[in-house]
Amino acid sequence: MILRMWRARATISRAGDYIRHATTVVFPKIRAIEGHRGEYLLRRDVEDGVELVVLTLWDSMMAVRRFAGQEPNKAVVEPEARAVLTSFDEYVTHFQVVDGYAAAVSKRPHTLPEK
């Protein structure tokens, strides 16, 4: 299994816009891709705003390519996301998952920020 990691930053006032876009537009799209096994969106407040980390899980690099295309190390950042982020990684990092466990979550563990 492959874990794909991408980082970005947003202002406190725009972080919710990115979270909303990721959870209502991007994640539903990637869930339909063969070989996608899950995703996590992490958020932490930092001195100059909010750091966001997206972790996606894939069966293989072939599955990653179904999402990212022929340049799987290049980040896929939609224009709507670019508009609300102050910075983001142009390239992602891939890890081979060697062990792991996550309890099943039957519903979202968070509430989307109000617009």
For each feature predicted by the language model, list its residue ranges.
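Short, well-ordered beta-strand segments in beta-rich or mixed alpha/beta enzyme
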Residues: I2-R9, Y40-E71
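Short, flexible segments with low predicted structural confidence
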Residues: M1-I2, Y18, H36-E39
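Non-catalytic surface loops within mature trypsin-like serine protease
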Residues: A10-I12, S60, Q96-D99
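Short acidic, gly/pro-rich beta-turn/loop elements at beta-sheet edges
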Residues: G16-Y18, G49, V64-R66, A102-A104
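Glycine-rich beta-strand-turn "strand-cap" elements at beta-sheet edges
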Residues: Y40-V50, V76-K115
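An amphipathic, aromatic/His-enriched active-site/gating alpha helix that lines ligand/cofactor pockets
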Residues: T24-H36, L57-H94
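Short, surface-exposed ligand-recognition loops at beta-strand->loop->(often short) alpha-helix junctions
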Residues: R9-A22
